[in-house]
C-alpha cells in the first residue's frame, strides 16, 4: 500500500512538472485599437520580446489589412493568408479587440472575441525573463513597421485565456484574472499598472502620444517598455564555438549586432576606443571597447542604451571639440533627429544627455531636410555636419548648439564622370582630411563601402574621384550569402595614421564582425594606399620562409608546411606574368571547391573568389600579396593599393594553399607565412 502511495505521488509530481514546463510558453496578448489607416504595414499593437525572439499582434505584414501572430523570422507565424478576413475602410473609427492565445503548441487569433485563425507552432517562453521588453507601433525592438490608430488598452496574461474569458474582458476595467502586464493609458504619463515595466521610451515623438485615455500612434510612432535594467557587459566566451573567428573583432552577445556598424572611435589619453551598434534588450545600443594597441580589446559596460538616451543609438561618428573634448554625433533612432553627446570622463563611460540637432534657415525657419546618418568635422574654427541619405544636407555651427542650414553637401559642379550619380545615397559617412584632399568615406545601401576624394568649394564638397571598397551589390538586403564590406568608421592613431574598420555582413555567427583595421594614406601621387594595421604583426608566430620558387603550368606549388586555421601569408612575385597566376586556398573536406586569388599584368582586376576589385600592375612592378585567413574569412591586400574580403563556406585546420600559373613559368621571390594568435586569449 505504501508503495502505491509513493507511486501515485511520483506520478502526480511528474505530471505537475511536465504541466508547469508546458505552461511556461502559454500566454495571451490582448489589445483594443481604433484603426485610422489600413495601409500601414508590419506594425504591432502589442509585442513581447526577449533578445531576438518575440511574439506580437502584427498588422499588414504579409498582406495589407490582415492580422498575424508575428514572430522572429516567422518561426511561429502562419503565412497562409488565404482564409483571413481583411480590415476595410469600414473598420476605420471602430474599436477592435485583437487577441492572440498561445496554448501548448497551438496559436489562436481572435477578433472581437471570435476566432480569426489558428495554427500549430512550437511556442516559447518569453515571460520568465526579467529583461524582456514590450513594444507598440514597431513590429519588434530593433525592427521597423507602422501602426496608425488609437490603442485604448493592452494586456498580457501568463495563461491561455478561454473564449469566454476573452469576451469578459473590458478595456480600462480590471479583470478577474491578474494580468502579467496592463496598460490602460489613463492619466498624464504612461504607466504599466502591475509595476513590471517602469520605463517607457517613445520614438518619433510627434507621431506618438498618450492623450484622452489612449495611446495615439501614427505612422512611424513607437513605444518601448521595459523594467529595471541590469547593465550589460559583452564578454567573449572562454570556449567559443569552433567557427568563431580568432583575430577579428565581433559581438559575442547579449543581443545581436545587426546592424553592427563600427561607430565613434577615438584615441584619447593613451587609449583607443571603438563603439559599435548592437540590439540590446531595449533597442539599439552602442557597445564600447577599449585597447592600448588596437589588437587586444576589452569591453566596457554598455551605458549608451535607450534607457539613458531615450532613443536608439544608430549610425554616427566620433570627433573632438576645439577644446579637445571627445564628442559624438549620431542618428537617434526613433527620435527623428540627429544627436550630439559629449564625454564626461576619461574612460568614455559617462556622457552628457543627448542634444538634438535642429538647424534653421537664414530666416530662422526649419528647413525641409532629411535627418539621417550624420558626421561632424572641424574646418578652421567652424564645425560642419552632414545629414546623410540621397544628396545629403549640410549645416555649420560655431558652438555645436546653433546650427545654420547650408543646403546640400555636394557642390552643384559635381562631376558626371565619377561613375556614380550624386543621388546615390551617402550613409555611414565619415569626412576627414587625408594628404592634400578631403576624403568622404561612406556607404551606399546598394553598393556597400565606398569613398570620394575631393575638396571644398564655396563651402560645398566637390569630389574629383570615387572608388568602391566593396564589390557585392547589396540591393538593400542584409543577408544574401555573400560577404559585404559595409559601414566604415575611422580615426587617427597616436602617431597620426588614419585607421578604418568596416562591418562585415555575412549572416552568420557571431554577429557584428569587424574587418581587420586598415591604414589609409594618400601620398603625392594621389593614389590611396590601403595597408593592414601595423600592429597585427604582434600576432605572428612560427614563421616559415621560402625563397626563389619556380612554378610551372599544370604543376602547382603546395605550401605543405603552412597549417592552422588562423594564418598570415606574404607572397612576392618577381616580374609577374601577363597571363593569369595566383593562389588557391581553403576548400571543402576533400580539398576541392576552394577559392582563388588571381592576378596578371594584362588583367584590370584582382580576382578574389567571385569578386573582381579593380587592380592593375605597372610595367616591371613586382606583386606582393598579404593574405589573412581567419577560419573561413579571407582578407587580401595587393601592393598596398587594393584590399578585399571574402568569406568561404568551409573551415579547415590545414589551409590547403598552393601557387599556380596558367601558361608560363612563374617566379616567386619569397613566401612568408605565420600562424596568428587569438586576440581573445
Q: Residue ranges of each PLM-predicted region?
A:
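Extracellular, beta-strand-rich glycan-interacting domains
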Residues: 27-37, 144-171, 181-189, 668-677
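Glycan-recognition/cleft segments
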Residues: 43-71, 572-574, 580-604
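Extracytoplasmic low-complexity segments
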Residues: 18-24, 28, 36-43, 48-55, ...
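A carbohydrate-recognition surface predominantly in extracellular/luminal proteins
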Residues: 22-37, 44-46, 54-61, 94-97, ...
Amino acid at each position: 500500500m505504501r508503495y502505491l502511495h509513493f507511486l501515485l505521488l511520483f506520478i502526480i509530481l511528474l505530471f505537475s512538472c511536465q504541466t508547469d514546463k508546458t505552461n511556461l510558453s502559454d500566454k495571451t496578448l490582448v489589445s483594443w485599437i481604433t484603426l485610422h489607416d489600413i495601409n500601414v504595414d508590419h506594425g504591432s499593437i502589442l509585442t513581447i520580446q526577449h533578445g531576438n525572439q518575440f511574439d506580437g499582434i502584427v498588422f499588414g505584414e504579409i498582406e495589407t489589412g490582415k492580422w498575424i501572430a508575428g514572430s522572429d523570422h516567422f518561426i511561429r507565424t502562419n503565412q497562409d493568408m488565404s482564409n483571413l478576413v481583411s480590415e476595410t475602410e469600414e473598420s476605420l473609427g471602430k474599436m477592435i479587440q485583437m487577441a492572440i492565445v498561445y496554448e501548448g503548441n497551438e496559436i489562436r487569433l481572435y477578433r472581437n472575441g471570435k476566432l480569426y485563425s489558428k495554427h500549430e507552432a512550437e511556442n516559447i517562453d518569453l515571460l520568465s525573463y526579467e529583461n524582456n521588453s514590450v513594444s507598440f507601433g514597431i513590429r519588434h525592438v530593433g525592427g521597423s513597421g507602422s501602426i496608425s490608430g488609437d490603442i485604448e488598452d493592452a494586456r498580457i496574461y501568463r495563461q491561455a485565456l478561454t473564449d469566454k474569458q476573452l469576451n469578459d474582458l473590458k478595456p480600462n476595467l480590471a479583470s478577474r484574472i491578474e494580468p502579467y502586464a496592463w496598460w490602460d493609458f489613463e492619466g498624464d504619463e504612461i504607466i504599466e499598472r502591475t509595476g513590471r515595466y517602469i520605463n517607457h521610451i517613445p520614438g518619433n515623438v510627434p507621431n506618438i502620444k498618450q492623450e484622452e485615455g489612449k495611446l495615439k500612434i501614427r505612422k512611424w510612432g513607437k513605444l518601448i517598455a521595459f523594467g529595471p535594467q541590469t547593465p550589460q557587459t559583452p564578454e567573449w566566451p572562454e570556449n567559443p564555438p569552433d567557427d568563431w573567428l580568432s583575430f577579428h573583432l565581433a559581438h559575442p552577445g547579449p543581443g545581436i549586432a545587426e546592424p553592427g556598424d563600427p561607430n565613434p572611435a577615438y584615441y584619447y589619453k593613451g587609449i583607443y576606443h571603438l563603439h559599435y551598434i548592437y540590439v540590446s534588450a531595449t533597442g539599439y545600443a552602442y557597445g564600447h571597447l577599449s585597447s592600448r594597441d588596437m589588437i587586444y580589446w576589452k569591453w566596457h559596460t554598455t551605458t549608451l542604451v535607450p534607457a539613458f538616451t531615450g532613443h536608439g543609438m544608430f549610425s554616427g561618428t566620433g570627433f573632438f571639440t576645439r577644446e579637445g573634448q571627445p564628442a559624438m554625433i549620431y542618428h537617434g533612432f526613433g527620435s527623428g533627429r540627429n544627436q550630439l553627446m559629449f564625454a564626461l570622463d576619461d574612460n568614455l563611460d559617462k556622457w552628457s544627455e543627448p542634444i538634438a540637432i535642429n538647424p534653421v534657415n537664414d530666416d530662422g525657419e526649419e528647413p525641409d531636410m532629411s535627418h539621417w546618418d550624420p558626421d561632424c568635422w572641424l574646418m578652421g574654427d567652424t564645425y560642419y555636419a552632414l545629414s546623410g541619405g540621397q544628396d545629403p544636407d549640410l549645416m555649420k555651427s560655431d558652438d555645436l548648439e546653433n546650427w545654420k542650414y547650408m543646403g546640400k553637401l555636394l557642390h552643384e559642379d559635381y562631376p558626371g564622370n565619377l561613375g556614380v550619380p550624386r543621388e546615390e545615397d551617402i550613409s555611414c559617412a565619415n569626412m576627414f582630411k587625408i594628404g592634400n584632399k578631403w576624403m568622404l568615406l561612406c556607404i551606399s545601401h546598394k553598393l556597400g563601402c565606398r569613398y570620394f576624394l575631393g575638396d571644398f568649394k564655396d563651402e560645398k564638397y566637390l569630389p574629383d574621384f570615387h572608388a568602391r571598397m566593396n564589390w557585392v551589390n547589396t540591393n538593400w538586403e542584409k543577408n544574401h550569402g555573400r560577404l559585404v564590406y559595409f559601414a566604415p568608421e575611422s580615426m587617427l592613431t597616436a602617431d597620426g595614421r588614419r585607421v578604418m574598420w568596416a562591418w562585415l555582413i555575412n549572416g552568420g555567427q557571431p554577429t557584428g564582425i569587424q574587418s581587420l583595421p586598415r591604414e589609409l594614406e594618400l601620398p603625392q601621387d594621389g593614389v590611396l594606399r590601403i595597408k593592414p594595421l601595423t600592429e597585427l604583426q604582434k600576432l605572428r608566430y612560427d614563421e616559415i620562409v621560402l625563397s626563389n620558387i619556380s612554378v610551372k603550368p599544370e604543376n602547382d606549388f603546395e605550401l605543405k608546411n603552412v597549417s592552422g586555421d588562423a594564418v598570415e601569408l606574404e607572397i612576392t612575385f618577381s616580374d609577374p606574368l601577363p597571363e593569369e597566376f595566383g593562389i588557391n586556398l581553403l576548400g571543402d573536406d576533400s580539398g576541392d571547391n576552394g577559392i582563388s586569388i588571381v592576378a596578371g599584368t594584362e588583367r584590370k582586376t584582382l580576382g578574389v573568389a567571385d569578386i573582381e576589385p579593380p587592380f592593375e600592375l605597372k610595367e616591371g612592378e613586382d606583386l606582393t600579396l598579404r593574405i589573412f585567413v581567419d577560419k573561413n574569412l579571407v582578407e587580401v591586400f595587393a601592393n598596398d593599393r587594393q584590399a578585399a574580403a571574402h568569406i568561404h563556406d568551409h573551415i579547415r585546420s590545414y589551409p590547403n594553399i598552393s601557387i599556380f600559373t596558367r601558361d608560363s613559368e612563374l617566379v616567386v621571390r619569397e613566401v612568408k607565412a605565420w600562424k596568428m594568435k587569438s586576440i581573445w586569449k
